[in-house]
Amino acid sequence: MQSLKLEFEESAAEFYIASLARGILEGIKSGALTAETGIWSLGRPVFRNTLTTLPISAELKEVLESFDELDALTELGIDLQPTLQRMIDTLNRCQRSINVDASLIIRAISAP
């Protein structure tokens, strides 16, 4: 399987992780992705555990921890829209909190 690795400075971690999370949530909100996507993307413990050493906010960590609950809410018949909007609003705050001097340079590496 071909893989893609994205590299950026740790000081931009909050912005990029919040951006990725927001994109996935918007996809779920629009119906392009299922709620189950949360479990298999950013909701995976292996992903969240990697973030423990990064300088990211408690708000962002809380949103990421909620990713694995989205499918369960759907199975319980609970409307996801309010939860998704709350999570997206939190991610908006995370994105806006970036230091204006932080480098947003990103490097992509493709590997077999």
Functional labels for PLM-detected ranges:
Residues 1-112:
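Acidic, Ser/Pro/Thr-rich low-complexity regulatory regions
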